[in-house]
Amino acid sequence: MDSGKYWERVLRCSKNMSLSRVRRTFSIMGRDEDSSDNDLAAFYYPALQAADIFELEVDIAFGGMDQRKAHMYMREVAEKNQWTKPTCIHTPMLSGLKGPGGRMDSFDHKMSKSDPENAILLDDDSESIRTKIRKSFLDVGNDKSPIFEISQHVIMPKLGKVVVSPDPKYGKPSEWTDQQQFVDAVSNGEIHPLDAKMAVADALFEVLEPISQHFSDKQDLIESINSISGKS
């Protein structure tokens, strides 16, 4: 931050907030309220995050559902200090590709860029997406499995259907416009899990292809981002 007022802002974000109130924000770090009593840094984080939003003069704070409690904390801070309160928009969380889906209020298995093989990155090309999805976890009886979550929250709203195209030796192509019927078809064996994965992979790339194309000739930018994030 270039602003010499930043740390003053952090202190103002901390003032008049109790420890119990700060604990209620800990889902932003994938922790429960009682897990950070031996980690003082955890209590700093909500104030730092709130200060960032104010210093950047953000009008709309956008994040996953795991950010909701921290954003509500930020809005309380704004009200106490008579600062502008940003609007907050929160999206569903997608489970990481390697593990089973969890409840919406549990973020232990969320997709995260900190593990690129466990997540779909916006600049992934078609082959990367297919490889990651092929290796991903699919519990056929669990509609919260990562593959089903991607279908529900990304593909169905954007494309309106999942197109399954198995090897002709094993079946005929099929289209699914209803999420639950798609899940049921995989669960009862009508669709082979691998065919379901590849259908989701192809549909996901169709959604993300414009972004992938945008970054295809900006390798210097990608390398700069990777150098900051530590991605090789």
Task: Label each region the model flagged.
Residues A50, R68-S232:
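Conserved nucleotide- and phosphate/pyrophosphate-binding catalytic cores
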Residues M1-H90:
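Divalent-metal (Mg2+/Mn2+/Ca2+)-assisted nucleotide/phosphate chemistry catalytic cores
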